[in-house]
Amino acid sequence: MSRYRGPRVRISRRLGDLPGLSRKAIKRPYPPGEHGQKPRKPSEYAVRLEEKQKLRFNYGLSEKQLFKYVKAAKKLQGSTGQILLQLLEMRLDNTIFRLGMAPTIPAARQLVNHGHICINGKVVSICSYQCKPGELITVKPQESSKQLVESYLAFPGLANIPSHLELNKSNLSGKINGVIDREWVALQLNELLVVEYYSRK
């Protein structure tokens, strides 16, 4: 299953607030379609599937990509669910979004793909790059790159920057001081249900 490229608000109406996907307010807070307003009791499978879909759409991943992250999280020591969230949050595209350098993760992905972003002085065009403590994210020293990020910083997607990140607006840079804590993950979901979903497949 490839990455979703359809209407973002439609997905938000179905899954709830997905801060990384869209900044648009949900005018009708119920699922799309003629049966969207009818209350239904979902099955256990449907609940696990919905949590998995929240994760996939918020971070803009294909099914194959998310499955790879789950497998990687299981190999590391600690809570698989929390490690999974840390791996996704430390992606370069998400880190740019959380710094406020882009209003959404898709917008951050465009910055990376178009070569506007540097890490420790070198252009990095891989959205899935895993940011590490001690690294410095800067904007390419080109006027068009600076103007674009400055316009995004004026209206950030989220109000608060996580404690592991440090933004310097004056020189358009962000320092990574550690790994994100669970409490700073903006997406509301139960990550254990995502792990359960894949363990039952």
Curated annotation (Swiss-Prot):
Kindly give the SUPFAM superfamilies that the UniProt entry links to this protein: Alpha-L RNA-binding motif
Where is it mostly found? plastid
- Annotated region described as Disordered, given as residue ranges: 13-43
Q: Which PROSITE patterns match?
A: RIBOSOMAL_S4, S4
The entry's keywords: Chloroplast, Plastid, Ribonucleoprotein, Ribosomal protein, RNA-binding, rRNA-binding
A Gene Ontology molecular function term for this protein is: rRNA binding
Q: Quick one: a GO cellular component term?
A: chloroplast
GO terms in the biological process aspect are: ribosomal small subunit biogenesis; translation
S4 RNA-binding domain: from which residue to which, for each copy?
90-154
User: Can you say where in the cell this protein is located?
Assistant: Plastid, Chloroplast
One Pfam family recorded for the sequence: Ribosomal_S4
Q: Which cysteines are joined by disulfide bonds?
A: none
At the top level, the lineage of the source is Eukaryota
- InterPro entries per the UniProt record, alphabetical: Ribosomal_uS4, Ribosomal_uS4_bac-type, Ribosomal_uS4_CS, Ribosomal_uS4_N, S4_RNA-bd, S4_RNA-bd_sf
Subunit structure, as described in the record = Part of the 30S ribosomal subunit. Contacts protein S5. The interaction surface between S4 and S5 is involved in control of translational fidelity.
General function of this protein:
One of the primary rRNA binding proteins, it binds directly to 16S rRNA where it nucleates assembly of the body of the 30S subunit.
Similarity comment: Belongs to the universal ribosomal protein uS4 family.
- Annotated NCBIfam families: PRK05327.1 (NF003717), rpsD_bact (TIGR01017)
Put simply, this protein is called Small ribosomal subunit protein uS4c
Instruction: Specify the species.
Output: Porphyra purpurea
Native organism taxonomy: Eukaryota, Rhodophyta, Bangiophyceae, Bangiales, Bangiaceae
